[in-house]
């Protein structure tokens, strides 16, 4: 071999040094995304003096194959395929200095069926990148070929309704309060009262695990005694979300097996356990015919601010792939952050077989879920019977409405609080099915029902005027057009 000739060819193909990301091929304004590409929409805030196109190219580069300098080993790979490509940059409406940048990733960059691998690329590095003041992942689109590598929810909405034999209306639940401090026996008493009064589910809260005042095994035993007694007395299938979140997967599996042995139909985990753990426990639930409830504990640390972090609609998409049956998605009218249209977008991501572009609700891409099962959204946090017409109008039937304080704080007791919520729901569903305008007539419908139900009357007298009217920090930004109507 002619060494000299080889060296010359090497120099022609490779030159050491630092190039702009756009020059390295991470920007292509003419690129047309393929059906098999993974697409991501970032909201970026470049540092002063940084060109938005270069910033977008940097996001594409640092979330795929690039590093800060040219490396000769690029020539050992199919660079043109492996490079992510920023293909569109546009100013965020009404927000100077911020830009939407669209990035396409070849499917070959991702391991099949692994949220951990997906997130390591998409959010693993770019959010600390110095040329950006801030960055937020607003939305994603997954090709059908990629969606098919995931198993999705172990039970799904249809399977859960068939198992519970409950159709045509939302499910009702409540979180046991206070979150911490009750003994196992008193905890079970709360669960029994709520279920006996008319709720479908009671639940553990995110931070009740196994503390000195109540060991997890005691809680499970007393809770399932309450569930079985309430089920026998009402003739309805009842349940309680037993939180199996623990410090290790081995301990989580141990708690899940014990819950199953007691006859529980559902277990719960917190988002903070991580995506690998979530996918692992989802697989266990699939194998053991259990419903998996997901509490989104901790999400607000990175989903709430508009300029930096991850939109919850993306988290919802990841969790549908990962395989949860229930997911807390906000209430819009309760105590927690949530613009009504934006929250409806989260629900649509969970429940629809195909998402169309819906800019007012923050959905920027079409998404075909390829027959992946649907996730049941959960509305929880500061809601009460007086808001039943708003909740039913906003979210429809496929939702779990959880009234924690609105059940356990009832002036006539826990069972009365549950009855108030059940009567309010039944009255509102009946009125809706009769063709009445529940948005307008809701308060009147509730008061009419309260004439025959003292617990509902007491609930309306106690909380009827309670609202949480704060401006949402996370709303959708888009340019209104004739085809994008509010």
Swiss-Prot record:
Lineage, broadest ranks: Bacteria, Pseudomonadati, Pseudomonadota, Alphaproteobacteria, Rhodobacterales
More details: The basic functional RuBisCO is composed of a large chain homodimer in a 'head-to-tail' conformation. In form I RuBisCO this homodimer is arranged in a barrel-like tetramer with the small subunits forming a tetrameric 'cap' on each end of the 'barrel'.
Entries under Pfam families matching the protein: RuBisCO_large, RuBisCO_large_N
Residues annotated with N6-carboxylysine modification: 203
Entry EC number(s): 4.1.1.39
Induction pattern: Expression of this operon predominates when carbon dioxide is limiting.
Superkingdom of the organism of origin: Bacteria
GO MF term (any one): magnesium ion binding
Name assigned to this protein: Ribulose bisphosphate carboxylase large chain
Sequence similarity: Belongs to the RuBisCO large chain family. Type I subfamily.
Residue sites binding Mg(2+) per the record: 203, 205-206
Subunit and partners: Heterohexadecamer of 8 large chains and 8 small chains.
UniProt keyword list: Calvin cycle, Carbon dioxide fixation, Lyase, Magnesium, Metal-binding, Monooxygenase, Oxidoreductase, Photosynthesis
């Amino acid at each position: 071999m002619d060494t000299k000739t080889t060296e010359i060819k090497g120099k022609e193909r490779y030159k050491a040094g630092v190039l702009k990301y756009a020059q390295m091929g991470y920007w292509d304004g003419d690129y047309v995304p393929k059906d098999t590409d993974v697409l991501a929409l970032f909201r970026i805030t470049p540092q002063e003096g940084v060109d938005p196109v270069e910033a977008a190219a940097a996001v594409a580069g640092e979330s795929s194959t690039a590093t800060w300098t040219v490396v000769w080993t690029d020539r050992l790979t199919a660079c043109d395929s492996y490079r992510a490509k920023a293909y569109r940059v546009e100013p965020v409406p009404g927000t100077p200095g911020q830009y939407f940048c669209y990035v396409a990733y070849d499917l070959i960059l991702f391991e099949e069926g692994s949220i951990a691998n997906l997130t390591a690329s998409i959010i693993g590095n770019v959010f600390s990148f110095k040329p950006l003041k801030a960055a937020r992942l607003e939305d994603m689109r997954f090709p059908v070929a990629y969606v098919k590598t995931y198993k999705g929810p172990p039970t799904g909405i249809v399977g859960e309704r068939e198992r519970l034999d409950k159709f045509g209306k939302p499910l009702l639940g409540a979180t046991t309060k206070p979150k911490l401090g009750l003994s196992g026996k008193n905890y079970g008493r709360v669960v029994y009262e709520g279920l006996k009064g008319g709720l479908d589910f009671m639940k553990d809260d995110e931070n009740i695990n196994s503390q000195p005042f109540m060991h997890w095994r005691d809680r499970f035993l007393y809770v399932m005694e309450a569930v079985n007694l309430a089920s026998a007395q009402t003739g309805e299938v009842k349940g309680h979300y037993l939180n199996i979140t623990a410090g290790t997967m081995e301990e989580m599996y141990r708690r899940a097996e014990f819950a199953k042995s007691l006859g529980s139909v559902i277990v719960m985990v917190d988002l903070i356990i991580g995506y690998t753990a979530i996918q692992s426990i989802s697989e266990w639930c699939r194998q053991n015919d259990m419903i998996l409830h997901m509490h989104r504990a901790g999400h607000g640390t990175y989903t709430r601010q508009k300029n930096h972090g991850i939109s919850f609609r993306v988290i919802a998409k990841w969790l549908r792939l990962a395989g949860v049956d229930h997911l807390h998605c906000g209430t819009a009218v309760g105590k927690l952050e949530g613009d009504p249209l934006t929250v409806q977008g989260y629900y649509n991501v969970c429940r629809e077989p195909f998402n169309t572009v819906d800019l007012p609700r923050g959905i920027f891409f079409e998404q075909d879920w390829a027959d992946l099962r649907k996730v049941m959204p959960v509305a929880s946090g500061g809601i009460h019977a007086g808001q039943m017409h708003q909740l039913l109008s906003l979210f429809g039937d496929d939702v779990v409405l959880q009234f924690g304080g609105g059940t356990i704080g009832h002036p006539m007791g826990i069972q009365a609080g549950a009855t108030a919520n059940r009567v309010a729901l039944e009255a509102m569903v009946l009125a809706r099915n009769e063709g009445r305008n529940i948005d307008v007539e809701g308060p009147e419908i509730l008061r009419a029902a309260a004439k025959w139900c003292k617990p509902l009357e007491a609930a309306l007298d106690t909380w009827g005027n309670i609202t949480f009217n704060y401006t949402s920090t996370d709303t959708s930004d888009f340019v209104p057009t004739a085809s994008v109507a509010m």
